[in-house]
């Protein structure tokens, strides 16, 4: 965050944040409201939600949704972390792909016909068309997402400029702590759910406010969220579905429904299910997203209706600093998308999916807490933060 502010000289900082489920197909560790507090305490001025219909998608759709929201908020610069760290290399790679589009598409099809996943096929296709050191490594997850952010900016004819910060010391999927002060999200999550989990083990890798809020959430609600806690619901859901039912679920295609229904019969945990389900054709992340859609009962038709315009239909405001509130007050007449401070009275196909996702997310809670949290989510107004006193209002 501090590097972003230093690089962009920003007046205010806006974060677009996923809701209950994330792009890699996992439930968020804690609720979006706790994560909003974390962001505000770390210097973000406005926190807005990326709807489920975009946040649990491949990089291209995820980026389109995020950029459409930032564009509507009249953001002048976007900053993202990447393995490459050189913004000009992203633009060079986009230019090469555009010039070699016919060859690129042919190669992707060729590699997919050989049984590779779409992600692997595109990575291999890029290897074949990119020869210069001024191009990015498209096998790296943060490079891929950054590439799609810039493509979305160009596609949406936005005047937004892009900046990137190089990731170092740890990689996205690292499962262990390889540095004294920097760790991947994967390694932090693994530590939090380990047999001898302790918040003290991760305190040197995350901001103090974040560690405090994580501990507070676990104390107040008795848990942090991961896939294993939803496995019994997930298995029950699949046990009551036919292959035809499953085919209606978003991202279930090419006969995947038969493999899923077969593998669930002998699986006693989500991890063991995923280990038996994965193939060369489908990445772990791609399968996890499909599982998320099964869990939330999100159909192809629902996603089509929600994403028909290919941009976010509204802006759900989750939190703001005093500075962020001033920015919104000054610019609200220029912002074309409706800004939602709660969702109780607003109606849209995208929001229908969101409500289901929230219901599922809180399903692991005991009553009456579960009902209280669901009711509160629809009526919850944006969290306000006074950055001068470092206190929530």
From Swiss-Prot:
It is found in: Cytoplasm. GO terms for biological process: tRNA modification. InterPro entries: Rossmann-like_a/b/a_fold (IPR014729), tRNA(Met)_cyd_acetate_ligase (IPR008513). Belongs to the TmcAL family. SUPFAM superfamilies: Nucleotidylyl transferase. Its EC number is 6.3.4.-. It comes from the Bacteria. It holds the Pfam family HIGH_NTase1. Keywords: ATP-binding, Cytoplasm, Ligase, Nucleotide-binding, RNA-binding, tRNA processing, tRNA-binding. Its main location: cytoplasm. Catalyzes the formation of N(4)-acetylcytidine (ac(4)C) at the wobble position of elongator tRNA(Met), using acetate and ATP as substrates. First activates an acetate ion to form acetyladenylate (Ac-AMP) and then transfers the acetyl group to tRNA to form ac(4)C34. GO terms for molecular function: ATP binding; ligase activity, forming carbon-nitrogen bonds; tRNA binding. It is an enzyme of class 6 (ligase). This is tRNA(Met) cytidine acetate ligase. The gene is tmcAL. NCBIfam families: PRK13670.1. ATP binds at residues 81, 142, 167. It catalyses: cytidine(34) in elongator tRNA(Met) + acetate + ATP = N(4)-acetylcytidine(34) in elongator tRNA(Met) + AMP + diphosphate. It comes from Bacillus thuringiensis subsp. konkukian (strain 97-27). HAMAP family: TmcAL. GO terms for cellular component: cytoplasm.
């Amino acid at each position: 965050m501090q590097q972003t502010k230093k690089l962009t000289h920003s007046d205010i900082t806006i974060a677009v944040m996923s809701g209950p489920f994330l792009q890699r197909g996992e439930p968020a560790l804690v609720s979006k409201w706790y994560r909003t507090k974390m962001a505000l305490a770390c210097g973000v001025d406005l926190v807005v939600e990326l709807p489920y219909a975009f946040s649990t998608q491949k990089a291209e759709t995820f980026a389109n949704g995020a950029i459409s929201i930032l564009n509507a908020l009249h953001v002048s610069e976007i900053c993202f972390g990447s393995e490459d760290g050189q913004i000009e290399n992203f633009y060079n790679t986009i230019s090469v792909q555009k010039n070699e589009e016919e060859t690129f598409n042919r190669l992707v099809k060729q590699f997919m016909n050989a049984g590779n996943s779409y992600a692997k096929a595109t990575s291999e296709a890029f290897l074949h068309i990119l020869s210069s050191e001024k191009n990015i490594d498209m096998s790296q997850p943060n490079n891929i997402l950054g590439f799609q952010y810039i493509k979305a900016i160009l596609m949406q004819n936005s005047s937004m400029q892009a900046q990137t910060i190089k990731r170092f010391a740890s990689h996205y999927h690292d499962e262990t702590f390889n540095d004294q002060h920097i760790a991947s999200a994967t390694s932090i999550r693994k530590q939090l759910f380990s047999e001898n989990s302790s918040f003290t083990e991760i305190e040197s890798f995350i901001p103090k406010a974040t560690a405090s809020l994580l501990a507070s959430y676990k104390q107040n609600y008795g848990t942090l969220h991961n896939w294993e806690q939803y496995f019994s619901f997930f298995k029950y859901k699949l046990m009551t579905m036919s292959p035809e039912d499953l085919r209606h679920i978003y991202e279930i295609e090419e006969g995947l429904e038969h493999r899923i229904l077969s593998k669930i019969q002998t699986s006693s945990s989500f991890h063991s299910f995923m280990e038996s389900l994965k193939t060369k054709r489908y990445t772990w992340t791609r399968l996890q997203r499909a599982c998320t859609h099964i869990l939330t009962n999100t159909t192809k038709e629902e996603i089509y209706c929600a994403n028909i315009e290919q941009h976010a239909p509204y802006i759900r405001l989750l939190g703001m600093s005093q500075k962020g509130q001033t920015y919104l007050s000054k610019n609200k007449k220029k912002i074309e998308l409706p800004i939602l401070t709660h969702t109780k009275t607003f109606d849209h196909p995208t929001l229908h999916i969101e409500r289901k996702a929230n219901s599922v997310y809180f399903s692991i809670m005991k009553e009456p807490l579960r009902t209280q949290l669901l009711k509160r989510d629809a009526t919850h107004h944006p969290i306000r933060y006074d950055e001068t006193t470092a206190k929530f209002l």
